[in-house]
């Protein structure tokens, strides 16, 4: 059977149970009641000390074009079995709500809202799957990229992962997220076109194999490409590859820009040191050594500890697949809903797993920045009607272990959420990708080094205001009393 993509909208990119719930709301007449959902994750990925928020641009694209196509509706009616009246209702759905969100490149931490959805219940429900799909993946990859870039430091980090990504869209949106996280280029030409990311690349072993001779292959490559990085490990790196690269570079002289060589196998620490010596002695002290071959932050850390002479890092599989953590685990939880009297009432989910307890109510997230050293003291979650900037002395305390507390003075309370959609209308001006990357990099300066350690980082504080904490406790008690816990 041929898969048909014509008239394929992303609106059906949802779980069946979302549509089932919408049908139940619609039949009961509560589908237009205002609802508020928070998007957040509970635990930081990779054991990291922070996350980098990404995915907002695609969320905007998704919501801005939110509608069921006629083929969507035909499928839901004929193949899934929804009734015609409900199908007619679905035909009218557009996103008419409000979105407040962190902007891309923002530092994010566990149990704080990344994004808040306020919309009629049916609309807010049906968009859950796609929003989580987008934000979970892109935030995961941006965070992985940032971890790697922290280890790479001032050297160049290049994204090489397309062939190992989980399908085509994962490759390009993962590349975009990696750029937000600090990578300087991508090998994916489509991502370069779509997002303006600088593209970079060398050549494969197949070039050398096609000519059966490194000298001929390097010559043919140099004849067609002025900027040359030769892959030197097809046969023997030190006996053949590096000497041949040097020979061709000398013969071509000023006719090419001999950028350097790439190592893709073997002991990268040993080979890079030997190759560096050979290049220097041949009169190419500025030639760069590029390394690839299943690299990640841990391998790079070890190579640096062993004195590897590597200038540029091509990272693929373990970046684009977030190799050591398959998913972020972001969730989408109802925190407030309009009742039959038209009043907003807070909702809470209580679980046998304490980490799954939600924080009810419409909230704001602030970053508390010490004015004396421009470092963050922690993030501070308040109810919607609070403004910590009005406080001269702010008490910050652990939301579970409340005896852990501190007072902060002389601070700036920076609100992390901005209006993205208001009543279904996009009100946010998307920055370009370079600006987002610069913002992410600048944000990292707010953190002490202890929070940025690759291994066993210090836990960053995410605290509730007294009022927000009391509201949470009140809602817990209300639920316990209603169910006679």
Task: Report the location of each language-model feature.
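N-terminal, Lys/Arg-enriched amphipathic/low-complexity engagement segments
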Residues: 35-91
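Hydrophobic residues within beta-strands of alpha/beta enzymes
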Residues: 200, 261, 289, 311-313
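Short coil/turn segments at secondary-structure boundaries
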Residues: 74-75, 143-147, 161, 452-459
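Short amphipathic alpha-helical segments
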Residues: 55-58, 140, 432, 436
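Gly/Ser/Thr/Ala-enriched C-terminal appendages of enzymes
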Residues: 2-33, 37, 46-48, 295-485
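Short hydrophobic "strand-cap" motifs at the C-terminus of beta-strands
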Residues: 292
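Buried, small/hydrophobic-residue-enriched core segments of structured protein domains
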Residues: 2-34, 43-45, 81, 87-96, ...
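Alpha-helix initiation/capping motif
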Residues: 15, 55, 68-72, 76, ...
